[in-house]
Amino acid sequence: MTASTSSTPSTSTKIPSSSKSSVTKQTKQKRNERERKRVDQVNQGFVLLQERVPKAAGNKAKLSKVETLREAARYIQELQKQLGMSSTSFHNSMPADFPTPEQSPVYPQSVCSMMAQTPSPSYTSPYYPPPQMMSSNQHDMSSHYYQESSSSSASTSGDHHSFYSHTETY
């Protein structure tokens, strides 16, 4: 008895159903693993952000992701206010007098004390030489560059800072 074959050319190249399902299973497993890894990375990022954003004095509960983002936005706005930065001056100029973390009322005191106790690492790398003091000639050239770039960016600013200037009250 002879086996009947279909007249369509695709039947000769068909993958057996058992190997087809294993390919599909492997593909699904890989896709699921990538998604789990992505979700884990997002969650780790939120944990780090929650650790860095100061909480209100009475709020000891863990913040949700949305609350964490809102608090981070408020914290950034507060820091900008303390630095005297408006949305337009944020990119065009930097104030000369920055408050230290100890002077900041919103900066977590535990971090301040931890930073004071932790010695600065002495990092050396053959790829990145240590910073060197600028000569007065180099300083003059760099300050001239920044003056030109800030004036040119101010004249061509248009509306590309509108994302940063949009503030919402939460």
From Swiss-Prot:
In this chain, composition skew of type Low complexity spans 1-26, 143-157
Give the keywords, sorted.
Answer: Apoptosis, Differentiation, DNA-binding, Neurogenesis, Nucleus, Serotonin biosynthesis, Transcription, Transcription regulation
Q: Name one GO cellular component term.
A: RNA polymerase II transcription regulator complex
Q: Where in the cell is it found?
A: Nucleus
- What is reported when this gene is inactivated? Egg-laying defective. Reduced expression of the tryptophan hydroxylase tph-1 which leads to reduced production of the neurotransmitter serotonin in the hermaphrodite-specific motor neurons (HSN). Inappropriate lateral projection of HSN axons. Lack of netrin receptor unc-40 expression in a subset of HSN and VC motor neurons. RNAi-mediated knockdown prevents cell death of a subset of the serotonergic neurosecretory motor (NSM) neuron sister cells, and survival of NSM sister cells is increased in an hlh-2 mutant background.
Give yes or no: UniProt keyword Cell membrane. Answer: no
Annotated spans, Disordered: 1-42, 118-170
Subunit details = Efficient DNA binding requires dimerization with another bHLH protein. Forms a heterodimer with hlh-2.
Q: What is this protein called?
A: Helix-loop-helix protein 3
Originating organism: Caenorhabditis elegans
